[in-house]
């Protein structure tokens, strides 16, 4: 019986860069239709989330992408919501001193990013979205990226709506109209019916 109960619990990991606004929507889904016992939520960075999904110790991983060169065939994905890309800057950034600041003006500043957070290595263009390999000071993780931005008067591109930060500011700039997409990654062959139902619920509650 205990083993059955354990197998009926959905294990959902959420990218650690995603803020409380998104988590509140997850709680709403539980409160409206489910019980706390139905889920086991975890806050994970994308490296760990990708590995756990691949190793079948996670049923759904919610984030911007997987840290695999090629997405395994057994892993599916469902877009949940897109948000405009913004420029994350430090609270004391000199960028704040320029009220008419535009995206091209950022060329004077150091840009930071990490491969563990895909929004930070995008070009920011909606019509031609690309991942960049040059012009960015790459660091290991999101926390380090935020510290580098803060202490070096730099910036990083991020999800303007769902990026988690406690210090600093988020700017929406003319010239950056690209979007970050939060997706649900899942194992195709596990609990097919239940996973499909939950994915639909996730999409609906996030867009509500």
Task: Tell what function each PLM region has.
Residues 75-111, 196:
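Flexible hinge/capping segments at coil-to-helix
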